[in-house]
Amino acid sequence: PDQKDGFRWLMGISRLALGPLLADDMGLGKTVEILAYLEEFREQKRDAKVLLIVPASLLGNWGRECLKFTPSLDFSIRHGKEAKKKDFPFLTIVTYQGAATSAAIQEEKWDLVILDEAQNIKNRNTKQTKVIKALDRKQAIAMTGTPIENSLLNLWSIFDFLSPGLLGDEKDFASFVDSTAEDKMENLKKVVTPFILRRLKSD
C-alpha cells in the first residue's frame, strides 16, 4: 500500500510540473515507486530521455531492480568511459561523477532527471553540484532518506535543483533559518510540505 500511495503521489505532483522529493526511510520502496512511475512516463512519452543519477555503490542494484520489476524498460548503465557515449536509451543510469564529467550527458536535453541519494548535491560550491543543477531538463525528481543531514541548507540545495527559486537564493534562505522564530519555521513547512513525501518505518 505504501508503494501504491507513493506512485499515486508522484503521478499527481508531476502532472502539476512540480519537482517532488521522495524522502521515505530506506527500505520503504522508493526504487519500486520510481520504476512504476517511469513505466507510466514511458507510456506517455515514448521518445523521452530520462537520466537517473545514483551513487556508484547503487549502480548494480538499480540494474537488478530494473530487470526484476520493469524488464521491458529500455535502459543502460553508463559507468567509466561508457558515460561518454552520446546515444541514449529511454533510461540512462549514471553515477554522480559520471554525470559531472560527461560532456555528452551535459549537452543532452533531458525530459526527466532523477537524483537518488540527492544529499550528494548538498554543497552548492562543488563542481559536481553545479554541473548537475545546470543539466537541461523539463522535469526533476529527487530521492533521499535523509533530506536534512546537518543543516536546513541541505534541503535548500535539493529544492534549488527541483524547483529553482522556490526557497529563494541561498543567502536569503540562510538568513531565514538563522531565525528561530517558530512562525517562520511553520511557514517553511507550509511551503515545502506539498512537495515532500516522507514516511518512516516507525509510522
Question: Model features per residue range: what roles?
Answer:
Residues 1-203:
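ASCE P-loop NTPase motor core, strongest for the SF2 helicase catalytic module
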